[in-house]
Amino acid sequence: MSSEATFGSMQIGLATASDIRDWSFGEVKKPETINYRTLKPEKDGLFCEKIFGPSRDWECYCGKYKRVRFKGIICERCGVEVTRAKVRRERMGHIELAAPVTHIWYFKGVPSRLGYLLDLAPKDLEKVIYFAAYMITSVDDEMRHADLPNLQAEHDLEKKQLVDTRDSDIAGIARDLEGELTKLEGEGAKAADKKKARDSADRQMANIRKRADADIDRLDQVWDRFKGLKVTDLEGDEGLYRELRDRYGLYFEGSMGAEAIKKRLENFDMAAESESLRDTIQNGKGQRKTRALKRLKVVNAFLTTKNSPLGMVLDAVPVIPPELRPMVQLDGGRFATSDLNDLYRRVINRNNRLKRLLDLGAPEIIVNNEKRMLQEAVDSLFDNGRRGRPVTGPGNRPLKSLSDMLKGKQGRFRQNLLGKRVDYSGRSVIVVGPQLKLHQCGLPKQMALELFKPFVMKRLVDLNHAQNIKSAKRMVERYRPQVWDVLEEIITEHPVLLNRAPTLHRLGIQAFEPMLVEGKAIQLHPLVCGAFNADFDGDQMAVHLPLSPEAQAEARVLMLSSNNILKPSDGRPVTLPSQDMIIGLYHLTTKRVGSAGEGRIFTSPSEAIMAHDAGVLHLNSTVKIRLDNFVPGEDWEAPAGWEAGQPAIVETSLGQVLFNDTLPADYPWVEKVADKGQLSEIVNDLAERYPKVVVAATLDNLKDAGFYWATRSGVTVAISDIEVPAEKPAILAGYEVKAAKVQSQFEKGLIADDERRQELIDIWNQATNDVADAMRKSLSASNTINRMVSSGARGNWMQVRQIAGIRGLVANPKGEIIPRPIKSSYREGLSVLEYFIATHGARKGLADTALRTANSGYLTRRLVDVSQDVIVREDDCGTEYGLTLPIAVADSNGELVMHEEVENSVYARTLATEVTDAKGKVLAAAGADVGDVLIAELFAAGVTEVKVRSVLTCESAVGTCAQCYGRSLATGKLVDIGEAVGIIAAQSIGEPGTQLTMRTFHTGGAVSASRGEDITQGLPRIQELFEARTPKGVAPIAEAAGRVNIEETERQMRLVLTPDDGTEEIAYPILRRARLLVADGDRVEVGQKLVVGAVDPKQVLRVLGPRAAQKHLVEEVQRVYRSQGVGIHDKHVEVIVRQMLRRVTVIESGDSNLLPGELAERGRFETENRRVVSEGQKPASGRNELMGITKASLATESWLSAASFQETTRVLTQAAMEGKSDPLLGLKENVIIGKLIPAGTGLPRYTDITVEPTEEAKANLFTAPSAFSDFDYAGVGGDLAPEFQAIPLDDYDLGSEYR
């Protein structure tokens, strides 16, 4: 790949105005898009060809230059460069803003980065940016200090003048009043007139006094404000600010809008701020310290990177290329356009209006209003709806801004970068193909011809059936006869990939060799249905074609269905015979007493077959047959003198002989009935002991025999096969009496309602079980339904019980059990009431399934995200740690029995230490692979526990090592370097998610509800554990060893723990209805659970440490899956738990570069501490942090991965501010940028190998002139020269940098 060597990491940062102008090819000055008459882009508009490039290849706007020979010329008439039209996908423009605006991500994001940097509350910041308040940007302290005495004197003087003026005005009015009164006195006026004159004078004086006092107050206010004025002060009172500016404008500067912010940022001293914050953190407490920590993170981000904080204020806005925001003409002559064009037009219109207003010298208030509108227009372009009401288009639909283009399922990351459409693919309905081999699929001819079209056309030309590609294409389109012969030749040994959605685990995509079939449906091998979870009721599957030789080789070696027999979640076979095949093999291997030919002896199997064909020997009769090359089974008793390799006369049936013929020749003789369990054991054993080729062949034999004998068995179902047990009425009558007795006790008031319900439920459960037993006894061995269920082919006894026995108890819509059972069976038919109460459960089941699917899919997505960078990076990390796991436990009689969870805990691991028996004899060396055989040997030798390597204790810096992971469950061998074990773990846990129940069970209806003990189970419990949430009804654990006392008051109970070490008592308040696990005065150990309920994993981590927390999480997750009968290997859960515990919160930073309170990757924390210690300084201290999977995914070192997961804008904002560099170590990052993923064959150690094909191999590829003769590519299969045989990579020394 060309991009392979181009770059090793990807950095994101803040773009400054000069960056934006450098990227740009010209300024967009007009809001016009395209001319409605000519349909050509307008000059200087949003689609301008001069800026963004020509809209037709090699043609300028005015048409002066056409054709490729003018390449690179810039037309002197229209100024358009003659080049390809696709430059319109990459050339950017820009808009020069008449006033700066702030970037909404940095001001409105949570937390507000701008607010933290400038130490302003977000609402104050908003006031400044949107022109509601002035902000002081600089104060000349020295000049103010020097001039203060003079200014004070001036102020006092002015104040005195105001007072004097007031007093003199009042005195004047008093004089006038006196004269007036004297005049009135002389005229002998009435008292009323005098009063009127006095009142009028009083009013005038009051007005003067009020006005003067207001002026004096304002003067004082302005003066006090000026004296205490400092930078970043806000002033929302416009009048006060104007007066302040008019009087003392020399000493300070202030402004509003983004200009104020910009001025502040220009003068901001990062280093000094950082110092003062560190000082606050050292000496401060509480809120101040917390805020200082948060601010320091932001300040540090700018200090330690090349980022300038001025990038948060924009002087120019970039305009993205026009092809990424297209405008297309619809049929009716109207245009459909991208929302971005509307948002850009609003910005340009407002910008142009602002320029005009500034040129006209409009009043400040009008200009400010226009600036505010420009700010809002840019905000809605970047992130519409983040502040205020979103800008809407027709039909009140919010317009999609640049941020909306990135985030969510339909955003750029998830829609186009992580999920791409691919060519060379098709889809069709699937049907069963019982004649296929395990590695084959049937591909419809027409589909195959379309998929392989280019290959067929080239081959037609090579074989001279067509003169050129054009005529070859015509031949293919007209389905000429030669085409089909060529297609047959082309598809030989060219694998195709089949995929069924939903692809829940890696077995959802597998490779097959195509066989051409008639019709239009894809034929699928019946044994791979289990892996795809497919059935033939109308399912569809997609076909993909691997093109390159590398892709074909990978498909054939790694993905071929015959190589994917084991399930990655538990290492057990997934391609098991099912349904018809089981019933056929069951029919073949059962023995029937008293049938034709019983007791005869045959000299060979063929003689017995002849007798069967002649009708004198029944398939299931017990006979003796002489067998050559007989390999005895475990329980075969050899006659005296018999030696291995000799023929033997075996007592068996012809069916058993035919069944054993399907197994490998050296496989021990199986003399058991082949039901589902027995077949599973056989296939499991084959997968452990035989090469994959043999296993695949055997599976095909079993499938063929199964179908053949299923047809011959004549298994049918009729209504007469359903036999209702005769004892049913008697059983029910007996229990009716018991139920009536309980009811009467309740009516007499002897028992409470809860007890009555519980007892009735117990009674009817017992009745149901008795009827079920009677029904099973009444079914004969030859009954078809009995055979179907007993063999494991289909159905279970519970379903049969409901059809032929009794429907039993059902739940009401609340999920509580109704204490009256449905007594009818489906065979007898339900009454109306019974039918009605049965419908609740059925509907709930359907609604549940739909919810479960969505929740389970989201869980898988989070699991994949948190674990996607766990890749096996090295062979051995060299750790001495491991987990000690049990193999055997003593039962009630003191005898050793195999531990029930061995299959999913010890199996497929690597031993950490050697294992010896009681006498000291070494049974297995350290580093040995623990398989079924070794487990059996250790158990036989009486070993009870072993220490094994685990991902939890692995010390690899990145990813994990092969020894700690152990055996890859999908292949049965030690895991390869490069295996993406994190994704496998996520799939293994997520895939069975849909089988888990959704509900919070009420274990016995209302009874448990009264105790308030809802046990969260199923999927919600799994989510609670992986998200590390505190569970509902959390149970406390003892924080120290000591004695516990129970104290009760009327309101509540509390447990008081007195620690042994004499530290102060610890009190745990608990609910009165909680069930205690300790009694008053008991001794408890540290970490012991005190009450029934779920434990908070964070508490376990705090009290018992990380190892115990890991163990607790693994056990709890496994408990939920086991309760549903789902087997998942512990190592998958361990991989996820390792990711949850890989961060450390820094408590004290010491002399390191880490910040207190920072969440640091454990590897980075340890590396930094090693560096500090080696320089003789003080290392940082930290505590382990348990993070939920969502939080852990967002906290990853890779910003690309985090942004494509959730909260895209928040992640990108933070990453750009910190100037983060993505080392591209995980899988998602590389998928996003289109590089090969660094896992599997994408690792350098596998990609940098060249193997030259031999001439003989080239010649062998096609006998006729080769279709691929110009490829340096070796054919797969055929008789290849020995030097071209596959070579194990371990034989190559690939150099140390690949390790």
Curated annotation (Swiss-Prot):
Keywords: DNA-directed RNA polymerase, Magnesium, Metal-binding, Nucleotidyltransferase, Transcription, Transferase, Zinc
Gene3D superfamilies xrefs: 1.10.132.30, 1.10.150.390, 1.10.1790.20, 1.10.40.90, 2.40.40.20, 2.40.50.100, RNA polymerase II, clamp domain, RNA polymerase Rpb1, domain 3
The reaction(s) this protein catalyses: RNA(n) + a ribonucleoside 5'-triphosphate = RNA(n+1) + diphosphate
UniProt xrefs under CDD domains: RNAP_beta'_C, RNAP_beta'_N
Gene Ontology terms describing biological process: DNA-templated transcription
Record InterPro entries: DNA-dir_RpoC_beta_prime, DNA-dir_RpoC_beta_prime_bact, RNA_pol_asu, RNA_pol_N, RNA_pol_Rpb1_1, RNA_pol_Rpb1_3, RNA_pol_Rpb1_3_sf, RNA_pol_Rpb1_4
Enzyme Commission code(s) on record: 2.7.7.6
Disulfide bonds: none
Protein residues bound to Zn(2+) 2: C877, C954, C961, C964
GO CC list: DNA-directed RNA polymerase complex
Gene Ontology molecular-function annotations: DNA binding; DNA-directed RNA polymerase activity; magnesium ion binding; zinc ion binding
Cofactor list: Mg(2+); Zn(2+)
Subunit-structure text: The RNAP catalytic core consists of 2 alpha, 1 beta, 1 beta' and 1 omega subunit. When a sigma factor is associated with the core the holoenzyme is formed, which can initiate transcription.
Role description: DNA-dependent RNA polymerase catalyzes the transcription of DNA into RNA using the four ribonucleoside triphosphates as substrates.
NCBIfam families noted in UniProt: PRK14906.1, rpoC_TIGR
Family: Belongs to the RNA polymerase beta' chain family.
PANTHER family, per database record: DNA-DIRECTED RNA POLYMERASE (PTHR19376), DNA-DIRECTED RNA POLYMERASE SUBUNIT BETA (PTHR19376:SF54)
Name this protein carries in UniProt: DNA-directed RNA polymerase subunit beta'
The organism of origin for this protein: Renibacterium salmoninarum (strain ATCC 33209 / DSM 20767 / JCM 11484 / NBRC 15589 / NCIMB 2235)
Gene name as annotated: rpoC
